[in-house]
């Protein structure tokens, strides 16, 4: 009897993933059509993402599930309050507020088919300070494109013969998280652009790139002074595969200059999928379609955690925004400048330390600050800084929890390993916020 009952459950688990993947692909196409001005409403893409999310719910467990449920409850309560008090119900924003962001994340995931760092299995692993610096730069650049996959690929190689050391873990953690400052393919950038309407990708990246460079330099200097650095086992990096994301970034900027009205997230998602298909066709035409389809069936469902997290964040932002607007409540601030942005940055990083995901802090801040109409670039830069520093210091960040599960690293150690680094980066970030404010006047 129990076996008969378990069969439908098992069958659902086997089929829900591929179906969810196809729904995500449909949502990417619908989102691109909306962003390119083809007359389709954003709610179609949002609905497809929500259907995929419902199918993929069983894959989301632990802290991510708790955070998702909490955001849905708070956001839902805000929507209900606004409806009861003011008769306002922003269902469309809750349904489709993050559809462009999700389409970008899903579209960029196709780049893993053509941009993975390759290495000969028999190639010797480099050692010493030079290997540390090269691995740091490698995880930063590849992570800026293929996201957390870069950390897993490099970490698998480094831990194949011996347990990962705290030095190796720090290199991967800092190098990866710094990409949040500038990368157009990083989740942080999508969240920043979605929650700071009017922000300019070029401006955000222009401010973020020097900060990332300073962070990499600081990390290389700090970690090269640690004991045992001469025995550091690095990754034999080859940077040839980076020409593809470089070409994609150039295409995005070029098309954006030619068509500035087209949303940047829509450009990234549509061009990422298109460029991946073209590269696969040029490499081996007979395998292009099978590889793309395999990614749809198996790769896209793996983003179930991000999918549900950002869907719930859309509900949270809509709920808080609706409640604030319905109640007529405003912050006691005349303007939102660099000083206020600095305080917000410190608050969000502090919340990250105790396990509050940056997307929750950003969605909440967006709902509260929207009535003040802050400089979108200033607030966008602040969000990117909060993401970069919060991810590197929090024991409960998705990256550190993934490293715990994969490599047996105690995530609480990152508070100690990255603590002084994070404080120094916050000083640099606050200085950059004030410099940007002075420059933009």
Regions found by a protein language model. Name each.
Residues 222-246, 287-300:
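Flexible interhelical linker loops that connect adjacent transmembrane helices
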Residues 100, 124-135, 163-168, 302-306, ...:
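Membrane-interfacial loop-to-helix junctions in multi-pass transporters
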Residues 111-141, 148-169, 368, 373-376:
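Membrane-embedded helical hairpins/re-entrant loop segments and their flanking transmembrane helices
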Residues 251-361:
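Transmembrane helical segments that form the transport core of multi-pass membrane transport proteins
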Residues 27-32, 168, 174-188, 204-219, ...:
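C-terminal transmembrane helix pair
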Residues 21-26, 40-81, 101-107, 243-250, ...:
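Hydrophobic mid-bilayer segments of alpha-helices in multi-pass membrane transport proteins
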Residues 153-164, 189-202, 337-393, 405-407:
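Membrane-interfacial helix-loop connectors
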Residues 68-69, 73-80, 86-115, 136-137, ...:
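Core transmembrane alpha-helical segments of multi-pass membrane transporters/permeases
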């Amino acid at each position: 009897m129990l076996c008969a009952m378990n069969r439908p459950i098992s069958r659902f688990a086997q089929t829900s993933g591929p179906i969810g993947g196809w729904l995500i692909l449909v949502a990417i196409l619908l989102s691109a059509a909306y962003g390119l001005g083809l007359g389709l409403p954003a709610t179609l893409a949002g609905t497809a993402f929500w259907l995929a999310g419902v199918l993929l719910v069983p894959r989301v467990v632990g802290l991510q599930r708790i955070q998702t449920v909490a955001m849905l409850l708070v956001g839902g309560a805000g929507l209900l309050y606004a409806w009861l008090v003011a008769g306002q119900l922003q269902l469309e924003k809750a349904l489709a507020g993050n559809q462009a962001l999700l389409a970008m994340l899903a579209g960029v995931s196709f780049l893993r088919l053509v941009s993975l760092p390759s290495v000969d299995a028999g190639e010797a692993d480099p050692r010493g300070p030079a290997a540390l610096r090269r691995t740091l730069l490698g995880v930063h650049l590849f992570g800026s494109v293929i996201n957390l996959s870069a950390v897993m690929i490099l970490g698998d190689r480094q831990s194949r013969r011996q347990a990962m050391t705290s030095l190796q873990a720090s290199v991967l953690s800092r190098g990866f998280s710094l990409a949040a400052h500038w990368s157009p393919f990083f989740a942080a950038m999508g969240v920043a652009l979605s929650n700071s309407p009017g922000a300019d990708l070029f401006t955000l990246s222009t401010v973020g790139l020097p900060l990332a460079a300073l962070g990499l330099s600081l990390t290389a200097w700090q970690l090269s002074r640690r004991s045992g650095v001469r025995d550091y086992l690095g990754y034999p990096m080859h940077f040839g595969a980076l020409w593809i994301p470089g070409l994609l970034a150039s295409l995005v900027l070029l098309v954006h200059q030619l068509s500035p009205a087209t949303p940047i997230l829509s450009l990234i998602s549509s061009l990422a999928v298109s460029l991946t298909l073209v590269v696969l066709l040029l490499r081996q035409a007979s395998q292009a379609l099978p590889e793309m389809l395999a990614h749809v069936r198996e790769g896209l469902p793996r983003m179930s955690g991000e999918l549900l997290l950002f869907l719930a964040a859309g509900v949270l932002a809509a709920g808080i925004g609706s409640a604030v607007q319905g109640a007529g409540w405003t912050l006691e601030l005349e303007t939102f400048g660099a000083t206020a942005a600095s305080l917000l940055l410190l608050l969000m990083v502090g919340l990250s330390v105790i396990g509050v995901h940056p997307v929750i802090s950003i969605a909440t801040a967006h709902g509260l600050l929207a009535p003040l109409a802050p400089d979108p670039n200033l607030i966008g830069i602040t969000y990117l800084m909060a993401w970069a520093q919060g991810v590197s210091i929090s024991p409960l960040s998705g990256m550190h929890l993934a490293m715990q599960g994969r490599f047996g690293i105690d995530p609480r150690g990152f508070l100690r390993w990255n603590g002084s680094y994070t404080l120094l980066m916050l000083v640099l970030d606050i200085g950059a916020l004030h410099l940007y404010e002075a420059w933009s006047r």
